[in-house]
């Protein structure tokens, strides 16, 4: 186990998460007693307590007052906030994780973009207009792309879509910085944003689904060609 945390709390958090991932602390079992675990990791019990509370909030553990702390099946109990952690834990599975993430984005955006155009076209156009002033480099496009999808999610009037995008932000923007380093990807995205703007202006809500699906397919093809050069820094760094 190689841990690169920058603080005792960060080290303890990574130690426990990696132990759960590697089945040293399997789901459904209980953690060692607090004193034993603090000595094992090499941190104070106060630090360990804070870490356990944070991991419980993220769904890794269930703290049962008066009972031992239980290890959860994190796939069933955690939220989107652990995406970056999963990418760090299993780099070989990152391409599949990203494919799943982008598939979810495409599927839900066909719904919330169409709703935004129907119910709040002025807000949607305001969001899409930000594409007219983007600088032609990867970081700017990564930020723009995330903000456009997130902005349209909130423009739909259903904030839950926006919260889903919030949960994707960390890994999503890391992917974007790599993906948008490709000029072809930037060109395709601009064409997509402008097409959406035209559909919104025309009230052509029925064309949103096919437009978004086509963009998902075409951008996916570019992404798959780039995956062989996937950088290792897509995963979150130690604390």
Swiss-Prot record:
CoA binds at residues 99, 103-107, 213, 219. Residues 215-230 are annotated as: Binds acyl-CoA. GO terms for cellular component: cytosol. Keywords: Activator, Cytoplasm, DNA-binding, Fatty acid metabolism, Lipid metabolism, Repressor, Transcription, Transcription regulation. Changing residue 216 to A: Super-repressor, non-inducible phenotype, cells cannot use long chain fatty acids as carbon source. GO terms for molecular function: DNA binding; DNA-binding transcription factor activity; fatty-acyl-CoA binding; protein homodimerization activity. Changing residue 67 to S: Dominant negative to wild-type, decreased DNA-binding. Disruption phenotype: Decreased transcription of fabA, low to no change in levels of fabB. Up-regulation of genes involved in beta-oxidation (fatty acid degradation, at least fadA, fadB, fadE, fadH, fadI and fadJ). Increased levels of fatty acids; double fadR-fabR deletions have the same phenotype, suggesting a functional fadR gene is required for fabR function. GO terms for biological process: fatty acid metabolic process; negative regulation of DNA-templated transcription; positive regulation of DNA-templated transcription; positive regulation of fatty acid biosynthetic process; regulation of fatty acid metabolic process. Changing residue 9 to V: Dominant negative to wild-type, decreased DNA-binding. The keyword Lipid metabolism applies. Changing residue 66 to D: Dominant negative to wild-type, decreased DNA-binding. Residues 6-74 form the HTH gntR-type domain. Changing residue 229 to A: Loss of FadR repression. Induction: By growth in the presence of long chain fatty acids (C14-C18). Multifunctional regulator of fatty acid metabolism. Represses transcription of at least eight genes required for fatty acid transport and beta-oxidation including fadA, fadB, fadD, fadL and fadE. Activates transcription of at least three genes required for unsaturated fatty acid biosynthesis: fabA, fabB and iclR, the gene encoding the transcriptional regulator of the aceBAK operon encoding the glyoxylate shunt enzymes. Homodimer. Binding of acyl-CoA alters conformation of the dimer, separating the DNA-binding regions and disrupting DNA-binding. This is Fatty acid metabolism regulator protein. It comes from Escherichia coli (strain K12). The gene is fadR.
């Amino acid at each position: 186990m190689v841990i690169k945390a920058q603080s005792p709390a960060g080290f303890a958090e990574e130690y426990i998460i990696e132990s759960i991932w590697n089945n040293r602390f399997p789901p459904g079992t209980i953690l060692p007693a607090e004193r034993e675990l603090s000595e094992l990791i090499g941190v104070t019990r106060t630090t360990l307590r804070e870490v356990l509370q944070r991991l419980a909030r993220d769904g890794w553990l269930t703290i049962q007052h008066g009972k031992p702390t239980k290890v959860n099946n994190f796939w069933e109990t955690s939220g989107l906030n652990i995406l970056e952690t999963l990418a760090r834990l299993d780099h070989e599975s990152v391409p599949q994780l990203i494919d799943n993430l982008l598939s979810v984005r495409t599927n839900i955006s066909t719904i919330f973009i169409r709703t935004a155009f129907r119910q709040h076209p002025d807000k949607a156009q305001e969001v899409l207009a930000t594409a007219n002033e983007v600088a032609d480099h990867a970081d700017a496009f990564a930020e723009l792309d995330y903000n456009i999808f997130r902005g349209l999610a909130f423009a739909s009037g259903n904030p839950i879509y926006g919260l889903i995008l919030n949960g994707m932000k960390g890994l999503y923007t890391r992917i974007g910085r790599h993906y948008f380093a490709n000029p072809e990807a930037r060109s395709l995205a601009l064409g997509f944003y402008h097409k959406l703007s035209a559909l919104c202006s025309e009230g052509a809500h029925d064309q949103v689904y096919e437009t978004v699906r086509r963009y998902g397919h075409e951008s996916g093809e570019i992404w798959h060609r780039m995956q062989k050069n996937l950088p290792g820094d897509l995963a979150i760094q130690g604390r």
